[in-house]
């Protein structure tokens, strides 16, 4: 049964008159998949309701933050109490100290952390700090890894290691990105060549340990190990961008997953967001004390923000971290996520469709490919036309996945076995149609 979208269409047309493209973040516009975006009216648990009061099982969760599901009672209570005390002060609070202490307790690679308001702000500030701490200018990033929309990071791979990267957005002058070196993800040979050529100039290597903006592609253990070795050898800082993976794939973030495979492994700097705010605008970056003390007011690297450490956002984040720290939380979350990906794969395979899937904790991805891709070029081989059919088929059946082939999905603690079974059943029906 196709759900009625009339009220969503009315709102979308209204929005387009006053907001560019009708949305405040491009992926929400359904441009990749076509059709009308769903305008959310309310959300609770594993579900949201659109402008037509149609219910959807939500596998986006605000693109990751809603690990407990929408409207968790403990989080709502904490936020309501904080609101009654005041929205914003522009002055320090005890709660921001408590949140920083909790983050550092759970992620021991950092001695200090600075709170900001968005992942882009955190990544941008991390690069500035890395450059200030090392006295170097160049940074390495990988094609397909997304670190927010700061100018220096909006770069795609150039035509070889010796060339500058090319801006991927209008409005970014080439000279702004001339210090950004873009490499292929999971390519150790290319990584070694880049350090051999420019190692003494590299301030930092920034990477997503699991890339959530080319769907779900994880860094191989040998690749992460070599990144660590080369950064140490050449005096560059290894930055783990855990805006998406932090507290989403494991209590200690993705770095704790790699530490199980690489003895003594730690990144030098960590970027965090999403889950640490529990759905509020909150992000952070941190490192060892020797690096963080380069930040103003102690050092000469300037960073500031009017709403940094906002008292309502920190209340939301602190309540969320306390809930996910409870024993057995991640084991249960991972089981639910695996049951989803296993069910989807079995349903697709039964219809003769190419399908591969992967997950870690409460984060997952799938591809209409026989094998899991290892880099952006391989991801691009996925069947986008068939994905669009799958997306709309699920949407019509009340299941909301990312409206783009290159985005990861998220499971929350609120998703039940019944939710997963219903989702797999819906997917099975769609697979039968699109396999013909």
Curated annotation (Swiss-Prot):
Its EC number is 5.4.3.8. Its cofactor is pyridoxal 5'-phosphate. CDD domains: OAT_like. Pathway: Porphyrin-containing compound metabolism; protoporphyrin-IX biosynthesis; 5-aminolevulinate from L-glutamyl-tRNA(Glu): step 2/2. GO terms for molecular function: glutamate-1-semialdehyde 2,1-aminomutase activity; pyridoxal phosphate binding; transaminase activity. GO terms for biological process: protoporphyrinogen IX biosynthetic process. The keyword Isomerase applies. Keywords: Cytoplasm, Isomerase, Porphyrin biosynthesis, Pyridoxal phosphate. Pfam families: Aminotran_3. Transmembrane segments: none annotated. Belongs to the class-III pyridoxal-phosphate-dependent aminotransferase family. HemL subfamily. NCBIfam families: hemL, PRK00062.1. PANTHER family: GLUTAMATE-1-SEMIALDEHYDE 2,1-AMINOMUTASE, GLUTAMATE-1-SEMIALDEHYDE 2,1-AMINOMUTASE 1, CHLOROPLASTIC-RELATED. This is Glutamate-1-semialdehyde 2,1-aminomutase. It comes from Albidiferax ferrireducens (strain ATCC BAA-621 / DSM 15236 / T118). The lineage of its organism: Bacteria, Pseudomonadati, Pseudomonadota, Betaproteobacteria, Burkholderiales. The gene is hemL.
